[in-house]
Amino acid sequence: MAQQPTFASAALVSFFLALICSCSYAAWHHEKDDIPKSDVSLLEFPLNLELLEAEFFAWAAFGKGIDELEPELAKGGPSPIGVQKANLSPFIRDIIAQFAYQEFGHVRAIQSSVEGFPRPLLDLSAKSFATVMDSAFGKTLKPPFDPYANDINYLLACYVVPYVGLTGYVGANPKLESPVSRKLVAGLLAVEAGQDAIIRALLYERATDKVEPYGITVAEFTNKISELRNKLGDKGVKDLGLIVEPELGAEGKISGNVLAGDKNSLAFPRTPERCLGSCTAAAMRPSPAAFIPKAPTGKSPSLIWRIRAFSIV
């Protein structure tokens, strides 16, 4: 007959469980304490983009966002404007749903490493994307571009945003002092790069298809969007579309450009200022910002001041 556990043995088990939990808690706080203030600003700032992506992907796939699915991530910030469920095929919807869950994880990972801040006001309306596309082409598209209309439109809208975060992590990494910070950014960068690669590959498969009703190819859309981001980000080429002049392709030998990179096929870097330039202004100086209507959030006053000096928020 099995011996019943005694009070003493139960107490001993409880003690060891408490010890393990307290050690884990202490280790977690030790990691947070290891992050210097200079790193905190660089880690918090990407939350603006990660929250934007999380809402954009979740609403497109599920018809609801952080407020319904992961409300604690919003930290009481305002709900996004104009975002909606997209008219997607089952295959694309499945991919975007995966992206949404990945972004929830990214937001949680950053918030568990630094204090974070309430979700900023995000404008993900069709009108906001239409303004970006009009700016990219230097004319008013008729009818206005609707990112939620179909697979191609939505993937082109996706092309606008995640790549900015990817290059932002590349730009931030050399400035980070703590190994804990660099480990976090490396993990974020790896998945953001994967998302960007999938989006580009799906669009590259249809690069020569016309986007209706505009009669403009998918490749030309990507080229125009990339040119706009280069303009807004300043400091030369940090972005290339799906089909380029051969000298701009890998090793200067090919026009197909399914992954964007420099002359050595390394990812382009962007500073936080230029990341926000690509997401808040969308060539709308001096009119209202695109996806982040109010000033981006973060704890670096000098950084926010420099962004304002660029007249991009």
Swiss-Prot record:
What induces this protein's gene, according to its Swiss-Prot or TrEMBL record?
Answer: By desiccation (leaves) and by abscisic acid (ABA) (leaves and callus).
Q: Which InterPro entries match?
A: Pigment-catalase-like
* GO BP term (any one): cellular response to salt
Q: Which Pfam families match?
A: Ferritin_2
Specify the superkingdom. Eukaryota
The transmembrane segments are: none
- Where would one find the signal peptide in this protein? 1-26
Task: Tell me what this protein is called.
Answer: Desiccation-related protein PCC13-62
Give the organism the record lists: Craterostigma plantagineum (Blue gem)
